[in-house]
């Protein structure tokens, strides 16, 4: 079996899934206290780096995704599958788990 090299450019989501680069977690509190890694809250915001072709309708046609590459999005806390590529964190999630596009 050949080894597979994963990078952002080689990941193509299927269906209505999107691939999101997770924003960096806050390093310190508003009061200036530096947080250890195990105390940091998992971010729920990130930037879309890949988008699937869209959900398939009952008649076989595709429903175009409402989001696009480059959109900053807010998503459900426990949604998707966490993926680490290099030093960056990503999440692969369904479009329905996206709560909002952030301006």
UniProtKB/Swiss-Prot annotation:
Lineage, opening ranks: Bacteria, Bacillati, Cyanobacteriota, Cyanophyceae, Synechococcales
Localisation per UniProt entry: Cytoplasm
Pfam families registered for this protein in UniProt: Cpn10
Subunit architecture: Heptamer of 7 subunits arranged in a ring. Interacts with the chaperonin GroEL.
SUPFAM superfamilies cross-referenced by the UniProt entry: GroES-like
PANTHER family registered for this protein in UniProt: 10 KDA HEAT SHOCK PROTEIN, CO-CHAPERONIN GROES
InterPro entries xrefs: Chaperonin_GroES, Chaperonin_GroES_sf, Chaprnonin_Cpn10_CS, GroES-like_sf
Organism of derivation: Synechococcus elongatus (strain ATCC 33912 / PCC 7942 / FACHB-805) (Anacystis nidulans R2)
Alphabetic keyword roster: Chaperone, Cytoplasm
Name recorded for this polypeptide: Co-chaperonin GroES
UniProt xrefs under Gene3D superfamilies: GroES chaperonin
CDD domains with a match to the protein in the record: cpn10 (cd00320)
Any one of the GO CC terms: cytoplasm
Record bears the keyword Disulfide bond: no
